[in-house]
Amino acid sequence: MASDFLPVHRALLSVSDKTGLVELARALLAYNIELLSTGGTATIIREAGLPVQDVADLTGFPEMMDGRVKTLHPMVHGGLLGRAGIDDAVMAKHGIAPIDLLILNLYPFEQITAKKDCTLADAVDTIDIGGPAMLRSAAKNFARVAVATSPDQYPDLLAELQAHHGQLSAEKRFALAVAAFNHVAQYDAAISNYLSSVSDMHTTLPLRHEFPAQLNNTFVKMTELRYGENPHQTGAFYRDVHPQPGTLATFQQLQGKTLSYNNLVDADAAWECVRQFEAPACVIVKHANPCGVAVGKACSDAYEEAYATDPTSAFGGIIAVNRMLDVATMQSILDRQFVEVLIAPDYDADALAYATKKANVRVLRIPSTGVMNRYDFKRIGSGLLVQSTDSLNIHSDALKVVTQLAPTDAQQRDLLFAWHVAKYVKSNAIVYAKDNRTIGIGAGQMSRVYSARIAGIKAADAHLAVTGSVMASDAFFPFRDSIDAAAAAGIKAVIQPGGSMRDNEVIAAADEHGIAMVFTGIRHFRH
């Protein structure tokens, strides 16, 4: 099969994306390839002074119904589906000439339906019928026919034609066929998702369910991983076909070893946490939990404070900052500790040069523009849980003071900082903080009071004074015991959602200890 090169004598071009069309047509003609085309595609080729035959002349049947019917004809599909050495006689009998190359992309359904003023009629008009049919015909017959669905594929296609004197290999035809079927599957999934979400088709703009009756998501494999979460598991990394800008999946790896499954899980936790801060910030993550977070005048300051929270856990961690990482900060990190992954929006040249001293460190660049993904997905046995992303933040004017003592301005800033961090800590989550840095973090405990105790232990191990610090809890306190433990540690202000049956007991405990407490009315469970 490796030597199965076939010449291209005839090509059909029908594209909605006209990028590179004229250049492609001119290049194909240089190999004496006959061009067929439809509608606007043929017009552009002809206006460029290039010879092209209209499909309507081939079929003997005009385009009709505003272009809805133009290629659904045996002269077209027979030319694409005809098998060399098998269908030659029947093709000759009916005057069907082979089509060796199909260049086609589909009506822009996703772009049209993404517009706020898109009506149901607009969406339906953008559903391509003839295009997917031709793509499937050409891709099914990859033994003889090649098919390209995107301008991104033109350079490689032309390079192979040039390298092999107007011929394409079986491997190239097969790879293009797979891409074509993937393209059609993605297109049909987009149509299904849109129509399944329509709850009222009679309004001017269709009312749509947040969660469609059927969900079809498309992912593209970026790389296979050495193994999964553990060495006995296999693993791979897939990305949304349309990744949200600024999310982890858009990373560029600048150096270092191949990323592991656990690297990616931890990197996502670190990046999502750090990019919520407006001021320069640093987040250090271990096992998907922040073990140190700080905000400073510069990322160098933030790193120093974040590291000091828990130097033991920071070893072998993932470090993310939300500003360009300079050489001084790079040197401070790499000279002090072992790090698995570094993440930043960018790096100065000297920082990257210094990073090469530790060639195994994985250095990722992620443009910081963009918003959070709208939805989170979690697999369960034979099922998928879908929820809107926990993107709700709170500001000082929304805090409800529930104790006799109100927090000071400085405490209020620390409370909001700790609250932002708690959202990214596994439940039950307790965060001790002071002066825009974490003092101790208690994560993932089945009992909230134990998370509070662990936060205190972490602070003591790092020789950090808890006295005067604030405490954040991702969910309400079911009993007063966590407040008693916090008071014993020296906590002076608490932020929590509220909503417990025993809120009054918890508030009374805070008043007894002279602790200021505010309610957010928002819970931040993380599992």
Swiss-Prot record:
Catalytic activity as recorded in UniProt: (6R)-10-formyltetrahydrofolate + 5-amino-1-(5-phospho-beta-D-ribosyl)imidazole-4-carboxamide = 5-formamido-1-(5-phospho-D-ribosyl)imidazole-4-carboxamide + (6S)-5,6,7,8-tetrahydrofolate; IMP + H2O = 5-formamido-1-(5-phospho-D-ribosyl)imidazole-4-carboxamide
EC number: 2.1.2.3, 3.5.4.10
PANTHER family per UniProt: BIFUNCTIONAL PURINE BIOSYNTHESIS PROTEIN ATIC (PTHR11692:SF0), BIFUNCTIONAL PURINE BIOSYNTHESIS PROTEIN PURH (PTHR11692)
NCBIfam families per the UniProt record, alphabetical: PRK00881.1, purH
Keywords, ordered alphabetically: Hydrolase, Multifunctional enzyme, Purine biosynthesis, Transferase
Protein name (database record): Bifunctional purine biosynthesis protein PurH
HAMAP family: PurH (MF_00139)
GO cellular component, one term: cytosol
GO molecular function annotations of the record: IMP cyclohydrolase activity; phosphoribosylaminoimidazolecarboxamide formyltransferase activity
Annotated ranges, domain MGS-like: 1-149
UniProt remark on domains: The IMP cyclohydrolase activity resides in the N-terminal region.
Similarity remark: Belongs to the PurH family.
Biological-process GO terms, alphabetical: 'de novo' IMP biosynthetic process
Gene assigned in the entry: purH
Pfam families per UniProt: AICARFT_IMPCHas, MGS
Lineage top rank: taxon: Bacteria
UniProt xrefs under InterPro entries: AICAR_Tfase_dup_dom_sf, Cytidine_deaminase-like, MGS-like_dom, MGS-like_dom_sf, PurH-like
Pathway the protein contributes to: Purine metabolism; IMP biosynthesis via de novo pathway; 5-formamido-1-(5-phospho-D-ribosyl)imidazole-4-carboxamide from 5-amino-1-(5-phospho-D-ribosyl)imidazole-4-carboxamide (10-formyl THF route): step 1/1; Purine metabolism; IMP biosynthesis via de novo pathway; IMP from 5-formamido-1-(5-phospho-D-ribosyl)imidazole-4-carboxamide: step 1/1
